Structures are given as structure tokens and as C-alpha cells.
């Protein structure tokens, strides 16, 4: 899922917002990392762009979205899952969305802004410090007492984050296991746990631990153990695609490996 964020006007990313559209074109042309990983892992790729020419509002000045926009994006995420899907990985593209993910995580689980933000797409230390100030300003404006997932995402989220939450919720309804990517998709899914309903994500796994400082805190808060720690920070669901190959290996071993009795191997005495 892809969308743009108004908070980039605050200088929280070294890349301009038009990169989001350019990367969507790259996905569609088959030239991105996720295209190669999906082919290798035997995954079908679907790309959903959400109003790229209409960024969310800068959430330091007002809520990022109104509740109707959040619900619309969640429905788009739910609708993106094909009828034949039996395993879902989710990822995102959106310049500025690590700032949104950090703000959502802080609003949901508390702590200091400096503990949730990181370099994202390549900020230096001064940029990370500035980013923490932006997240803190947003929390000061909107508060951390959002009573449900929709209000939380309306205050701080992006359309692609809401779409991920909608897809994760739809997968829960359809009993489809979900492999989350990194920090951003984990933050999007965490919105569904408002009210301390961590069991809302019982069908979800976290594929890998992102180097973004907030991801370890978030995974711990969600009581999830990421499968891999490869220092990946690309996004695009790339970590989830790599972890899928581990899942395939586990299934192949489970289904094909003979028991000691079947293989005629003597057991311990």
C-alpha cells in the first residue's frame, strides 16, 4: 500500500514526496526489490496506491485524516485481499511514514519521542532529533488517549497505514495468517490493539526486526518475536518476503520429513 504524508513539510525525510509515486511505478514495472523477492518466494504481488496526489494533513497542525478517510482506506486494504489468498504479507511505500509510525506507537504505548524515532530513509543525527521534536509536538496536540483504532489513525496515521490495518483485520475475519514487514506495518497493525486487545493480532507474525529504534520496543509491546534480524530497512514488504522463504522451508520440513519410525531409525534407549 502506498500514500503520501503532509508531515514531510516539517523536514522529517531527506527524500521528496514524489518518490512515493516513482516507487509505485517501479513496483508496477517489476524493477523493485519486492518484485524479485516475490518471484523468488512464490508470492503474488498487489500494489494499491491511495490518493498519492492528496497527502494527509500535517499532523502537527491538525489530525492527519478525518475518521471517514480512515475507514475508506481500511476498506481499500480489506478489498485488496484476493478471494484465493491463504497467506498475506503486508508492506508499504510512503515518504514520511516512519514519522507517522513513531507517533502512532508513542500514542499507543507511551514513552519518549526519542525512543520511537530513527533515521528512516537516511536522516543524520540532527534530523533524527528534529523528527523527535515533531513527533512530540503531535502528541502534545492530539494526546495519547485515542479511544479506538480509527481515532488513533485519524490523528497520526497515513492512508497506507490504515489500509494495512484494514487488510490485517480482514485477514483475521477470514482466518488468514499475516506476515508483517517491519516497523511501519507493525505500527499500523498495532492500532487494532487499542483497548489492550493484543489478541487482535494473534494471527500475525513479525517477519524481521528493523534497525529503526522503535521497532524493538513495539515488537516487545505486542509480545511478538521477529523471525529475522538482518538489519534490513528497505520497506516494500521485503523483510516479510524473505521471512516467507523461512516459512516455506519449515512447512516443507514438517510435511516431508519422516519420523524415526517411518525412517527405520532406532530411538534412544
Predicted regions and their residues:
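N-terminal loops that bind phosphate or other acidic moieties
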Residues: 1-269
Amino acid at each position: 500500500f502506498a500514500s503520501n504524508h503532509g508531515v514531510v513539510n516539517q523536514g522529517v525525510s531527506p527524500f521528496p514526496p514524489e518518490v512515493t509515486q516513482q516507487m509505485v511505478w517501479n513496483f508496477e514495472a517489476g524493477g523493485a526489490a519486492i518484485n524479485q523477492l516475490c518471484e523468488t518466494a512464490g508470492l503474488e504481488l498487489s500494489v494499491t496506491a491511495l490518493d498519492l496526489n492528496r497527502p494527509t494533513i500535517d499532523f502537527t497542525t491538525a489530525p492527519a485524516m478525518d475518521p471517514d478517510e480512515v475507514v475508506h482506506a481500511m476498506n481499500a486494504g480489506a478489498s485488496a485481499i484476493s478471494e484465493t489468498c491463504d497467506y498475506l504479507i503486508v508492506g508499504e511505500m510512503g515518504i514520511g511514514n516512519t514519522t507517522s509510525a513513531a507517533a502512532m506507537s508513542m500514542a499507543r504505548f507511551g514513552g519518549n519521542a526519542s525512543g520511537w524515532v530513527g533515521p528512516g530513509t537516511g536522516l543524520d543525527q540532527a534530523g533524527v532529533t528534529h523528527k523527535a521534536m515533531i513527533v512530540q509536538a503531535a502528541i502534545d496536540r492530539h494526546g495519547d488517549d485515542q479511544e479506538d483504532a480509527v481515532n488513533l489513525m485519524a490523528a497520526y496515521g497515513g492512508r497506507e497505514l490504515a489500509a494495512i490495518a484494514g487488510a490485517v483485520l480482514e485477514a483475521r475475519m477470514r482466518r488468514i495468517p499475516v506476515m508483517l514487514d517491519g516497523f511501519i506495518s507493525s505500527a499500523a497493525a498495532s492500532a487494532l490493539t487499542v483497548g489492550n486487545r493484543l489478541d487482535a493480532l494473534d494471527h500475525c507474525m513479525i517477519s524481521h526486526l528493523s534497525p529503526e529504534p522503535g521497532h524493538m520496543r513495539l515488537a516487545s509491546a505486542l509480545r511478538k518475536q521477529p523471525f529475522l534480524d538482518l538489519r534490513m530497512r528497505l520497506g516494500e514488504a521485503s523483510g516479510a518476503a524473505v521471512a516467507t522463504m523461512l516459512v516455506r522451508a519449515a512447512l516443507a520440513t514438517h510435511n516431508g520429513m519422516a519420523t524415526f519410525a517411518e525412517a527405520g531409525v532406532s530411538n534412544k534407549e
